[in-house]
Amino acid sequence: MSESGSCLCGSVNLEYKSEPNFFLLCHCTDCQKATGSPVASIIGIPENDFIISGEVNSYKCEAGVIRSFCINCGSQIYSTAEGAPGLILIKTGVLDKQPSIDPTMVCWTDSKPNWLEIKHPDIKFEKNPG
């Protein structure tokens, strides 16, 4: 298996080979502000399996998450988090093919908009479970 993706303008490309460790839907206010969307769709893969080409810039937020984005088009590509050492957190919107697994966790549901329905109630957390 080899999966790939790119930013909106095509300047940044990524590739990985392993199955995702998890598939997370995050409703925290930081993810909402960073993505401009009510939810961030994220997969976690081992850092040593991540290949990226092209130039990114990064922003570190107070929560200890470093968000990396294309310097040309601004597409969020991936993040790293102090609480998840050794993992790359890829935004699934940049992938050429969406993950074939179901979400494994839906977190920060207390921050989601009221009009957004959670389809996976058995894996939802009002805050971050970690």
Residue ranges of model-derived segments:
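A short Gly-Trp-Pro
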Residues: M1-G130
